[in-house]
Amino acid sequence: PAKEAYRLAAATFRDAQVKHLNSQPWQTIKNTLTHNGHQYTNMQLPAADMKIGTQDIFPSAYQGKGVCSWDTKNIHHANNLWMSTVSAHEDGKDKTLFCGIRHGVLSPYDVKDPLLRQTGAENEAKEVLTAALFSKPELLTRALEGEAVNLKLVSVGLLTASNVFGKEGTMVEDQMRAWQSLTQPGKMIHLKIRNKDGELQTVKIKPEIAAFNVGVNELALKLGFGLKTSDSYNVEALHQLLGNDLRPEAKPGGWVGDWLAQYPDNYEVVNILARQIKDIWKNNLHHKDGGEPYKLAQRLAMLANEIDAVPAWNCKSGKDRTGMMDSEIKREIICLHQTHTLNAPGSLPDRSGQEIFQKVLLNSGNLEIQKQNTGGAGNKVMKNLSPEVLNLSYQKRVGDENIWQSVKGISSLITS
């Protein structure tokens, strides 16, 4: 009885915490950073601020609030849903360099009823698609005018697809099933969107989703958990993105081949990213830390952005691994903007790259998102494990002990 009383008290306390965190104001976070005379703006825009008129666009309105990562029984909303952008200030105006959608896992994993959990996962996936459409203003306008629009999304899960420690294997299954249910071949789906007059309007979209999962924590990269399961999803998604011939020297097919056939301005960058991804895949470099834990995940999101698809990425909570992915993307995007070259997979940032990374880690909005979700700022990716061999390469990548500690913050004191 004492154990049961403790369990009930803990659950009641947690529910109260969730209610408190959800009902805080969830507002857009904007930070600027300067490097080599260039000014960049990082913006994290929460679902509550995804508006065409005065209200947010979602049928189940957020009303200025949010859904924190601890709200694991919510079947109406995606957890921790934000649009993340980085822009450069050029010729008196801001030019968007990257825009994507970040969120928690598409699985209300503490819901016991499997049918209800599946319905919840599909509702969450629809919200991510709605946010993805919002991130493409021209496409959104066409959809609101009655056109059935094609929406390409590259989803990059960052979970460890194994149930050995925790339930992330089941969560990955829930997420993949939700994406599959929305993307049967030729399937049109109807989304309800609140238009500028505040009325719910049905829009028609034909979603195409390349759904990846790439484990990035110590369990995956040091102990090998979940790699085989993840790669069974990844090979299919790579075929969608790059065509059936995944040899590094092969001409890209799939979505990338279609994009390159138009001889776009970014032809070279797209080609290099495609080649890097195929090199990583061929040599299983994404199975090891190798100096860069997010090497595959980050390049998939960048490639999606370059070919005008919507990149979306998530871990379980949408704050720690998701936040580190956000920072790695922005580091590489700013480096590319400065040097016009892409870093090789597995390379540690050089001195300038480390400076950019340090500035991004402190000024990307990720510490604020952690605080919004838990009441405390800090990223749990930053760990000091014993034995030392289990540590990921983050101290080397950041290159400054004080900044590493600042980013780690109080995360080790926070559960899940």
Curated annotation (Swiss-Prot):
Gene Ontology CC terms, in alphabetical order: extracellular region
This protein's record includes keyword Secreted: yes
Molecular function in Gene Ontology: phosphatase activity
Motif (CX5R motif): 315-321
Listed EC numbers: 3.1.3.-
Alphabetized UniProt keyword annotations: Hydrolase, Secreted, Virulence
Annotated Gene3D superfamilies: Cell division control protein 42 homolog
InterPro entries named among the record's database cross-references: IpgD/SopB (IPR008108)
Compartments reported by the entry: Secreted
Positions annotated as active site in the UniProt record: C315
Keyword hit for Metal-binding: no
Domain notes: Contains the consensus sequence Cys-X(5)-Arg characteristic of Mg-independent phosphatases.
Known function: Converts phosphatidylinositol 3,4,5-trisphosphate (PtdIns 3,4,5-P3) to PtdIns 3-P and prevents the transition of PtdIns 3-P to PtdIns 3,5-P2. It is one of the known effectors injected by Salmonella into the host cell and is required for invasion and for an efficient generation and maintenance of Salmonella-containing vacuole (SVC). Alteration of the phosphoinositide composition of the plasma membrane causes membrane ruffling and actin cytoskeleton rearrangements.
Family: Belongs to the phosphatase IpgD/SopB family.
Name of the featured protein: Inositol phosphate phosphatase SopB
